[in-house]
């Protein structure tokens, strides 16, 4: 997304200029401003360029685990994870810091043994007593940025894990570790659905799945395009110079 935004604005730091730049997020305030006519004026690169942004598709950012592994068995037994539980899983913030940000950690991780290590068994005594490991896109990715906004609410940092702009690297990390969890676009999950499970997500940002009144919804073409896969359905943009 950063490359698409930069190249359509002829920002040489992002690569060769292009007439059409794809993005999986909206424009940042630091990149462009929207005028009264709905067009965006570039703030970096060639600032004389104006760009028209078009929604061309919808994508469901898919949270995935190794099919049949410990993480899959845990999450399947829970019926999915809430958005709040995803935040707890991926955040480097302590439980105390997350509580101060409005999360009910006793609902999110009711079996937490307070050892400072986030384990699947913290979510339920029926889950494996194994540390949760992470695999997710790098910070230059629009997918990373969308997850940071939709799930992390732009608070704190991600916990350490395997980070890569290459989804193949993430798939290898996920399938090589039954305790790993990660995320990327739905199309890439579809390519690997024989070896990965896309989990159901409840759009509750304060409590765990057991206490969330919102239904957990798994990504599919119908739930993504129909708007029920929230908060992880997102528009895909084409920006035309």
Mark where each language-model region is.
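Flexible loop/hinge segments at secondary-structure junctions
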Residues: 1-241
């Amino acid at each position: 997304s950063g490359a698409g935004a930069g190249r359509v604005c002829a920002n040489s730091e992002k690569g060769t200029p292009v007439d059409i730049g794809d993005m999986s997020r909206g424009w940042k305030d630091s990149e462009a401003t929207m005028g009264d006519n709905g067009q965006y004026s570039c703030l970096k690169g060639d600032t004389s360029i104006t760009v028209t942004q078009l929604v061309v598709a919808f994508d469901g950012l898919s949270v995935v685990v190794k099919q049949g592994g410990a993480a899959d068995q845990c999450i399947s037994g829970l019926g999915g994870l809430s958005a709040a539980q995803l935040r707890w899983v991926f955040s480097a913030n302590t439980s105390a810091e997350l509580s101060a940000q409005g999360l009910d950690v006793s609902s999110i991780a009711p079996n937490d043994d307070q050892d400072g290590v986030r384990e699947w068994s913290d979510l339920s005594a029926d889950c494996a007593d194994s540390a949760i490991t992470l695999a997710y896109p790098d910070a230059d990715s629009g997918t990373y940025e969308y997850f940071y906004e939709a799930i992390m609410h732009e608070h704190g940092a991600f916990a350490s894990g395997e980070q890569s702009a290459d989804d193949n690297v993430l798939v290898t990390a996920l399938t090589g570790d039954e305790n790993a969890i990660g995320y990327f676009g739905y199309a890439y999950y579809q390519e690997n659905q024989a070896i990965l499970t896309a989990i159901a997500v409840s759009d509750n940002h304060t409590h765990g799945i057991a206490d969330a009144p919102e239904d957990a919804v798994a990504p599919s073409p119908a739930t993504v395009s129909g708007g029920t896969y929230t908060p992880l359905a997102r528009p895909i943009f084409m920006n035309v110079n």
